[in-house]
A protein has these predicted regions:
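Histidine/acidic residue-rich metal-binding segments in metalloenzymes
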Residues: 1-68
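Short, solvent-exposed polar/charged micro-motifs at secondary-structure junctions
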Residues: 4-7, 27, 123-125, 142-145
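Proline-rich low-complexity regions
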Residues: 41-46, 74, 143, 155
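Metal-cofactor-binding active-site regions of metalloenzymes
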Residues: 1, 127, 132
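Short, glycine-/Ser/Thr-/acidic-enriched flexible segments
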Residues: 22, 73-75, 140
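C-terminal cap of metal-dependent C-N hydrolases
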Residues: 130-178
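His/Asp/Glu-enriched, well-ordered alpha-helical/loop segment
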Residues: 61-128
């Protein structure tokens, strides 16, 4: 709440905030569901539900001061599930579907494009990306993990069913990701 108020109180064009999917969807309760949940540990630490709601309200309001910032953290399982585990949540495979979920839930899908694709480059004075994506409303299951030569990475919402897949349309090709 305080961070949202601070960003909103500053002169437009000088201060903005990137917002992660985890801070839009999770509160501190998910850290301790039954026992410590290391794959939900991140920095800044998740706050109370009232804070999450304030962030959702700010992000879906259409304000140009807030934009996508996945802050993906692909730490290997063994570096998360240990006494001094790394902070961060790996959300790259699910980020766009999760942002779409939040915007749809509050009836603000018309503001999703600006949040994900326009506000950031405009704030930094960068050119806007000319590639296009299309979200397709379909159910898919998030993989339990992704295996790499260096170890397994557990994604945000591993094993859960999400609604939305991504069709990426570039100038040269079409790429479908059902994740």
């Amino acid at each position: 709440m305080d961070a949202v108020r601070f960003v909103e109180s500053c002169e437009e064009g000088f201060v903005a905030a990137t917002v992660t999917p985890r801070h839009l969807l999770l509160n501190r309760n998910v850290l301790f569901q039954g026992r410590l949940q290391p794959h939900n540990h991140c920095l800044p630490v998740l706050k109370r539900e009232i804070h999450r709601q304030a962030i959702v309200s700010a992000v879906t309001s259409g304000s140009k001061r807030f934009f996508l910032g996945t802050d993906g953290a692909p730490h290997e399982r063994r570096r998360k599930e240990c006494p001094c585990g790394c902070a961060g949540i790996y959300n790259a495979p699910v980020a766009l579907a999760l942002y779409a979920k939040v915007f749809e839930e509050v009836g603000a899908l018309d503001k999703l494009e600006a949040f994900t694709s326009l506000n950031g480059p405009d704030f930094y004075g960068l050119p806007r990306n000319t590639s296009k994506i299309k979200l397709i409303k379909t159910s898919w299951k998030v993989p339990e993990s992704f295996s790499f030569s260096f170890g397994d990475i557990i994604p945000m919402f591993a094993g859960e069913t999400l609604v939305a897949s991504i069709l990426l349309i570039t100038r040269k090709s079409v790429f479908t990701n059902r994740l």
